[in-house]
């Protein structure tokens, strides 16, 4: 494939934006390849400005659960645009999406719309601290909860991709109130609560850690979080920005049968437009302004375009949607294991609903330390060869791949064949 136009565009972009991008992973640094500039997408396919076609497993980093340019979403967006893009006042569309979210997410009795997942987690932590009167938050190594200061500590995903353990610019005074323990390690969490329990406002966790390459919870982990937080009077917060409506019809909390106090949402809830949300029990949510004294606001929160895209996306998801994802996931997982075994290359495949992660090591992978043992050099080679075969994968070992309703069995079979061809060139 040729990337002449992308390379020229990147040279210009680097004079205009730091690193030439508006989000670090788009620079493709960890796979040592030129950044690809995209032009358009349709269904399960995405097309770059050089005219190359790819089967897309990035899906805008998760939001496009229906694939690119879903006809129903696009049609209703056109109708919404004709009425106006933003009003700075409430619309009926906010009620529609809020009711749908409340109906689908077990923990949510009231919800507040925002414009990004980072806003959702930031505001949720403020709410947890204000509601409990406590200062400290517990998070898990390798779990990414957006780029607010108190959460950008041992954060996995983008930070891990860049090889940075933490981000400079996070003040010590903020960092000291964030306690970090290994993911899937209840014993470590118990020790943290024994030491700081009276000042822990909440525990925030990705119920499936999608920002270390898709790492599901081990048996009993989420229920253990529920039990420990209840014992100490702390809030359990599920960051379902990635897992929300991807792991199951009732999100990860419905799939695993564990209900948190507060939930953060994003990505799929916006159907490709900038949306975040957080919600939970009425008694907690009613502490937010204007009912309570915990402040939160946003100029474009609940804007009609985002509400339209979100509602028209979620309204098309049914329990049968997730059966389809499981079927495609089974085919892809079996194919990956077969092809990698054929070439004597170790692989560990982790799955949760329409999220799939593969690690180039013997496994198992249940935490960030084990995820870090993946062969990153081989991953970069694999990425480059797969792009040549017309498969667009996340350019980072620490990001998961995503399925959409637009993907077909044919797409999956082509992808498996592409892995076989790529490995044939890499493994001599």
UniProtKB/Swiss-Prot annotation:
The keyword GTP-binding does not apply. Pathway: Porphyrin-containing compound metabolism; protoporphyrin-IX biosynthesis; 5-aminolevulinate from L-glutamyl-tRNA(Glu): step 2/2. It catalyses: (S)-4-amino-5-oxopentanoate = 5-aminolevulinate. The modification N6-(pyridoxal phosphate)lysine is found at residue 267. One of its GO terms (biological process) is protoporphyrinogen IX biosynthetic process. SUPFAM superfamilies: PLP-dependent transferases. InterPro entries: 4pyrrol_synth_GluAld_NH2Trfase, Aminotrans_3, Aminotrans_3_PPA_site, PyrdxlP-dep_Trfase, PyrdxlP-dep_Trfase_major, PyrdxlP-dep_Trfase_small. Keywords: Cytoplasm, Isomerase, Porphyrin biosynthesis, Pyridoxal phosphate. Its main location: cytoplasm. It is found in: Cytoplasm. Its cofactor is pyridoxal 5'-phosphate. PROSITE patterns: AA_TRANSFER_CLASS_3. Its EC number is 5.4.3.8. One of its GO terms (molecular function) is glutamate-1-semialdehyde 2,1-aminomutase activity. It is an enzyme of class 5 (isomerase). It comes from the Bacteria. It holds the Pfam family Aminotran_3. The keyword Cytoplasm applies. GO terms for cellular component: cytoplasm. Homodimer. Belongs to the class-III pyridoxal-phosphate-dependent aminotransferase family. HemL subfamily. HAMAP family: HemL_aminotrans_3 (MF_00375). This is Glutamate-1-semialdehyde 2,1-aminomutase 1. It comes from Staphylococcus aureus (strain NCTC 8325 / PS 47). The lineage of its organism: Bacteria, Bacillati, Bacillota, Bacilli, Bacillales.
């Amino acid at each position: 494939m040729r990337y002449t136009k992308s390379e020229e565009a990147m040279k210009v972009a680097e004079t205009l934006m730091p690193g030439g991008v508006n989000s670090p992973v788009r620079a493709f640094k960890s796979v040592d390849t030129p950044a690809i500039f995209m032009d358009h997408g349709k269904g399960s396919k995405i097309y770059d400005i050089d005219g190359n076609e790819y089967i897309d497993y990035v899906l805008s980093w998760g939001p496009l659960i229906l694939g690119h340019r879903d006809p129903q979403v696009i049609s209703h967006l056109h109708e919404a645009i004709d009425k106006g893009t933003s009003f700075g006042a409430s619309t009926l569309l906010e009620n529609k999406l809020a009711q749908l979210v409340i109906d689908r997410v077990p923990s949510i009795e009231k919800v507040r719309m925002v414009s990004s997942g980072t806003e959702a987690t930031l505001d949720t932590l403020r709410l947890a601290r204000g509601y409990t009167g406590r200062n400290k938050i517990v998070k898990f190594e390798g779990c990414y909860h957006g780029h607010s200061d108190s959460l950008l500590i041992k954060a996995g995903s983008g930070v891990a991709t860049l090889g940075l353990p933490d981000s400079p610019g996070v003040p010590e005074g903020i960092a000291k109130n964030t306690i970090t323990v290994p993911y899937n390690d209840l014993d470590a969490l118990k020790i943290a609560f024994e030491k700081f329990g009276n000042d822990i406002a909440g525990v925030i966790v990705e119920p499936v850690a999608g920002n270390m390459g898709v790492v599901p919870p081990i048996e009993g982990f989420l229920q253990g979080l529920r039990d420990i937080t209840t014992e100490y009077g702390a809030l359990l917060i599920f960051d379902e920005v990635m897992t929300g409506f991807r792991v199951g019809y009732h999100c990860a909390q419905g799939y695993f049968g564990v209900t948190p106090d507060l939930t953060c949402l994003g990505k799929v809830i916006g159907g490709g437009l900038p949306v975040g949300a957080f919600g939970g029990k009425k008694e907690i949510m009613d502490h937010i302004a204007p009912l309570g004294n915990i402040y939160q606001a946003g100029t474009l929160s609940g804007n009609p375009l985002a509400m339209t895209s979100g509602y028209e996306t979620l309204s098309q998801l049914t329990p049968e949607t997730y059966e389809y994802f499981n079927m495609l996931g089974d085919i892809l997982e079996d194919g990956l294991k077969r092809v990698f075994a054929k070439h004597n290359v170790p692989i560990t495949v982790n799955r949760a609903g329409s999220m799939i992660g593969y690690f180039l090591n013997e496994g198992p992978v249940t935490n960030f330390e084990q995820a870090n043992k993946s062969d990153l050099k081989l991953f970069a080679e694999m990425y480059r060869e797969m792009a040549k075969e017309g498969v667009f994968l996340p350019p980072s070992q620490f990001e998961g791949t995503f399925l959409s309703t637009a993907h077909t069995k044919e797409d999956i079979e082509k992808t498996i064949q592409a892995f076989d061809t790529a490995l044939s060139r890499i493994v001599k």
